[in-house]
């Protein structure tokens, strides 16, 4: 048994690893900048978690793990290094966590959380992912098994440390380019390196970069391999059915072509571990993941959806699904609430963001969630002028409605049609309120 301390333990990726090592029998402590639902849950599970960070948290731990958000001057990190305790980033600790496991690793700019969660429904084993699966209510599931379904992150190239037995790549659209010195060759080399580390590879072969690879791989061609795509709504819950290659018909929770693609990649990966009949049945156990087309409230008058999409490609894919969902329900009004996430992402992808909201009836824009970045000047009013957007500092959930005060002091209330919030910051907390 090791004593392991996690700095930034409330983060979605770090908390999953902490939970996994705790279940393996290690003594886990941790800290974060403030209390959250996650830190409370970790305490309830038996971990020693404190807030905020303080040097007294560093005692006699065997090693310390810190999240990507932690800077070198963090008081706990400084204290641990002063005491000579080994310190590892999340990226650096992965070989220790995964070294003796048969890892089913899922990477990609978009869809990796959903695909990972779907795959965790299809095969037996532990699960370490960057989202809360509604099937088991956590970002981690522990099993006495060599198998681990792992969501592999390209943002800091940590997927290269994931020891994949089987590697899935949903797509390789350039993102987090600051980590790769804005060098596309470095970025694509990392994806190629990730795939080369695996014995089995499953890829979306219609991705611009992945289509050029000469590696031995199981290839999904969505435009021809996925047929008879159909969507249906039952009790306000979305489902997608489709035929995959010569494998027959499947149904999965969620709505849209991108959901069928994610499910197809998970199915092709699971075929190495699970009989086809069981895959078809197990896929029905998937109930979606938190913050992905997450229906918070639904009745005949008002539907509120929380979605983590924070890149133009993701927002457009989700909105296409929302429009289809609205059509099936006979709803005519769709309002989008957008909280930009990181100044660098907003400025780099501004043209994409200007285009991705086409079709919405109303656009509400929140301030940029900086995530620690320094501000970059962006003319938001000019960029989004075609939408005549409403700007507000925050939104509030009030019963079955969303309320906010706009920049002119006028109070607004959204209580009919579909309202969908987009962002990776704290918009989810605003939309949920105390509900």
UniProtKB/Swiss-Prot annotation:
It is an enzyme of class 6 (ligase). Its EC number is 6.3.2.8. It catalyses: UDP-N-acetyl-alpha-D-muramate + L-alanine + ATP = UDP-N-acetyl-alpha-D-muramoyl-L-alanine + ADP + phosphate + H(+). One of its GO terms (biological process) is peptidoglycan biosynthetic process. GO terms for molecular function: ATP binding; UDP-N-acetylmuramate-L-alanine ligase activity. Pfam families: Mur_ligase, Mur_ligase_C, Mur_ligase_M. It is found in: Cytoplasm. GO terms for cellular component: cytoplasm. The keyword Transmembrane does not apply. InterPro entries: Mur-like_cat_sf, Mur_ligase_C, Mur_ligase_C_dom_sf, Mur_ligase_cen, Mur_ligase_N, MurCDEF_pg_biosynth, UDP-N-AcMur_Ala_ligase_MurC. Pathway: Cell wall biogenesis; peptidoglycan biosynthesis. Keywords: ATP-binding, Cell cycle, Cell division, Cell shape, Cell wall biogenesis/degradation, Cytoplasm, Ligase, Nucleotide-binding, Peptidoglycan synthesis. ATP binds at residues 108-114. Cell wall formation. Belongs to the MurCDEF family. PANTHER family: UDP-N-ACETYLMURAMATE--L-ALANINE LIGASE, UDP-N-ACETYLMURAMATE--L-ALANINE LIGASE-RELATED. This is UDP-N-acetylmuramate--L-alanine ligase. It comes from Campylobacter curvus (strain 525.92). The lineage of its organism: Bacteria, Pseudomonadati, Campylobacterota, Epsilonproteobacteria, Campylobacterales.
């Amino acid at each position: 048994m090791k004593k392991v301390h996690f700095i930034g333990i409330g983060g979605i990726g770090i908390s999953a690893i902490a939970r996994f090592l705790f279940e393996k029998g290690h003594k886990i402590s941790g800290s974060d900048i403030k209390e959250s639902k996650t830190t409370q849950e970790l305490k309830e599970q038996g971990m020693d978690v404190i807030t905020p960070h303080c040097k007294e948290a560093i005692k006699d731990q065997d090693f310390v793990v810190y999240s990507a958000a932690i800077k070198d001057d963090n008081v706990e990190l400084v204290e641990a290094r002063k005491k000579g305790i080994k310190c590892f980033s999340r990226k650096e600790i992965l070989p220790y966590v995964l070294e003796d496991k048969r890892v089913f690793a899922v990477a990609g700019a978009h869809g990796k959380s959903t695909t990972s969660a779907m795959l965790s429904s299809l095969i037996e084993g532990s699960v370490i992912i960057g989202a809360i699966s509604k099937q088991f209510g956590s970002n981690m599931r522990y099993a006495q098994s060599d198998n681990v379904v792992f969501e592999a992150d390209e943002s800091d190239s940590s997927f290269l440390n994931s020891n994949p037995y089987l590697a899935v790549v949903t797509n390789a659209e350039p993102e987090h380019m600051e980590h790769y010195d804005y060098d596309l060759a470095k970025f694509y080399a990392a994806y190629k390196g990730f795939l080369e580390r695996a014995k089995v590879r499953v890829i979306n072969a219609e991705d611009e970069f992945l289509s050029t690879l000469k590696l031995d791989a199981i290839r999904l061609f969505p435009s021809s391999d996925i047929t008879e795509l159909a969507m249906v709504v039952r009790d306000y819950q979305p489902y997608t059915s489709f035929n995959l290659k010569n494998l027959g018909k499947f149904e999965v929770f969620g709505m849209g072509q991108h959901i069928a693609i994610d499910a197809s990649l998970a199915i092709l990966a699971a075929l190495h571990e699970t009989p086809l009949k069981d895959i078809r049945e197990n896929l029905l156990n998937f109930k979606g993941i938190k913050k992905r087309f997450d229906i918070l409230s639904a009745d005949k008058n008002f539907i509120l959806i929380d979605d983590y999409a924070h890149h133009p490609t993701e927002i457009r894919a989700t909105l296409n699904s929302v429009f289809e969902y609205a059509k099936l329900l006979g709803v005519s009004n769709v309002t989008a609430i957008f909280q930009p996430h990181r100044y660098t992402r907003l400025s780099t992808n501004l043209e994409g963001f200007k285009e991705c909201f086409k079709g919405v009836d109303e656009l509400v824009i929140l301030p940029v969630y900086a995530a620690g970045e320094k501000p970059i000047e962006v003319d938001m009013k000019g960029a989004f002028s075609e939408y005549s957007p409403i700007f507000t500092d925050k939104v509030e959930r009030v019963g079955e409605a969303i309320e906010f005060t706009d920049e002119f002091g006028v109070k607004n209330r959204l209580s009919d049609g579909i309202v969908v919030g987009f962002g990776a910051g704290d918009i989810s907390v605003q939309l949920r309120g105390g509900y």
